Amino acid sequence: TVDVTACAPGLAIPAPPLPTCRTFARPRTCGLGGPYGPVDPSPVLKQRCCRELAAVPSRCRCAALGFMMDGVDAPLQDFRGCTREMQRIYAVSRLTRAAECNLPTIPGGGCHLSNSPR
């Protein structure tokens, strides 16, 4: 049987995981503008990202952010001056904090690279 509460895409995490958050995180990390997204993403984009993240069970949010950034269908791209790792660190370590979406995750703190899938 399949555990539908498992922290995996298509189960407790939507598939594809958090597409708006991925779009939001790139310019927040890179500030690239142009074809890569706005230098300062709109508040609407942030609200959509936070709604997507809020819909994921709190215990699965770190995993969802990890799956989002390491997507199989469309992995992150390196940009000049903004590596995939920089984007990943921003998303995993900052999107759940008060300054962004202000959402609880695991007991004892926010997300860290060590508790997200790779």
Curated annotation (Swiss-Prot):
Alphabetical list of CDD domains matching this protein: AAI_SS
Superkingdom in the source lineage: Eukaryota
Annotated compartments: Secreted
Cysteines engaged in disulfide bonds, as pairs: C7-C60, C21-C49, C30-C82, C50-C101
Molecular-function GO term, any one: alpha-amylase inhibitor activity
PANTHER family linked: BIFUNCTIONAL INHIBITOR_PLANT LIPID TRANSFER PROTEIN_SEED STORAGE HELICAL DOMAIN-CONTAINING PROTEIN (PTHR34481:SF16), TRYPSIN/FACTOR XIIA INHIBITOR-RELATED (PTHR34481)
Function: Alpha-amylase inhibitor.
Name of this chain's protein: Alpha-amylase inhibitor 4
Taxonomic placement: Eukaryota, Viridiplantae, Streptophyta, Embryophyta, Tracheophyta
